[in-house]
Amino acid sequence: MRICGIKLTHDGAIAVVEDGRRLFCVEQEKRGNGPRYQSVDNLDAVVFALAEHGLNPRDIDQFVIDGWDGENESQFQLLSGAVPVALKGAPYVERHAEGLLDSVDGYGLLLGGEEFPYKSYPHVTGHVASAYSTSPFASAGKPALCLVWDGCIFPRLYYVEPQGARLIGSLFPMIGHAYAAAGLHFGPYRQPNRSSWDLGIAGKLMAYIELGSVDESIVEVFQGLYETRSAADTEQARRYRENINNAEASLAVIHDFFESSALRLKAKRAEDVLASFHVFLERLLVKEIAMVLLRHSSLPGARNLCIAGGCGLNIKWNSALRATGLFDDVWVPPFPNDSGSAIGAACGAMAAQDGFEPLEWSVYSGPALQESEVPPDWEAAPCSLPELASILADNKPVIFLSGCAGLGPRALGGRSILAAPTSPEMKDHLNDIKRREHFRPVVPICLEDRAPEIFSPGTPDPYMLFDHQTRANWRDKIPAVVHLDGSARLQTISRNSPHKIAALLIEFEQLTGIPLLCTTSANLHGRGFFPDAAAACQWGRVEHVWCEGMLWSKTVIKKSSPTERLLSA
């Protein structure tokens, strides 16, 4: 059975699964320097992705579209070539507690001039299915809980077992977008006009809050407003809780929440306000999930937790849940946000047919590197990994391009700017190169077996989804990757991994004794990863690009102007 999952809206992607094995997943932003979060606006993208992998639409047994906003159905308006197409889909959330696998069936998916039937499952179904089917619990045939906290929905807890899944309940009435919305009211991303939405704000705020401190008086303000505006037994609060299918109405309530907060917090620093709001939500999440577990502790698999939805990218909340001791294991896939929704749509269709089964998959299964010509003012020469390690040890950043792109929003080593972590100036230099704010962290990628020596807990974290503290005796040795609070957004990789980044780390370790490098994504500002070496060279902000055994080096070095070095807004 060959299933094609399609995510049409933001973080658009096309994925194909065959007999429980992931064949490929192409996120649109990772194609040709595409804009971040790019949607699928034209169905020709589906035809093109299939053709790249030797398939045409007739080779697909079932097409599945990820659901979106709507109480009973969602609506999509897009193109197929130059032909306008209107499609219907499933809603954002299931219509009843056991309705995760209820589909909306449609016809008229116009691909290459031919119409095809399709199914659509609720958006949350894709999150549940992608998280569980890629988890170690699915591989072992064990049930698990799955927490989905996304965009305009409250955090929802599901019970998933091979035979099916059901909603246990919503944990508390606070939509996932509340975290990013806070940034529109306080701090460097504050906007008087809040009609536009930047999907990148939440991740930036997670870094910015380290400039602040938790103030319990601020937490009390948020707690009080939450109890009266969201959780109270009043008509206004009940209407908010019941109107969950109306995204605009939910956001309006959240903006009103923060406007009321701002009136009470005029004397407080923005960084303290945001740090305190982060902790308010973290405590609420931990408290409410603990209360639910008290009522459902007898469920088999209740100590197994999967996390999905956009809030699954919050490494501090993930770590807080793991630290409660309520769970024996916590699994977060590398694509908890909507970058995993195409895979999730396909997994949802698998589950509807055969139950929730494990997916055979690899994180490095995005677009392959494209061939390209050496640009003017650049030269290319063979370069071994030991030679590359020596360049890095000389404190020279290098763009490292190898293999297929990773799935999800993290570069994970294959589309990365790498640098030695030993200089305190390197963090600022990399942030300047990327035109990022000074408070943004630079990630360490570390050999897995040595991570516990350097970080606490330092447990395996191949997808960069948990928080770690840098041990005191290492902070002066690797200052470029130590965040403001001493933490690190660690990525680990096994010494035995076939990925070339592992072999490079071993070479760097042999040269310096340090088993890690700085890593940050290699991309144009506001765009997906570089698709080829020439694109990285044309960007021109790093003098060396290593691509599959060849070192491309700039022959004419141009100094950046002061204007070029300004951080982008």
From Swiss-Prot:
It is an enzyme of class 2 (transferase). Keywords: Nodulation, Transferase. One of its GO terms (biological process) is biosynthetic process. The keyword Transit peptide does not apply. Coiled coil: none annotated. Its EC number is 2.1.3.-. One of its GO terms (molecular function) is transferase activity. Signal peptide: none annotated. The keyword Transferase applies. InterPro entries: Carbam_trans_C, Carbam_trans_C_sf, Carbtransf_dom, NodU/CmcH_Carbamoyltrnsfr, Nodul_NodU. Transmembrane segments: none annotated. Pfam families: Carbam_trans_C (PF16861), Carbam_trans_N (PF02543). Involved in 6-O-carbamoylation of Nod-factors. Belongs to the NodU/CmcH family. This is Nodulation protein U. The gene is nodU.
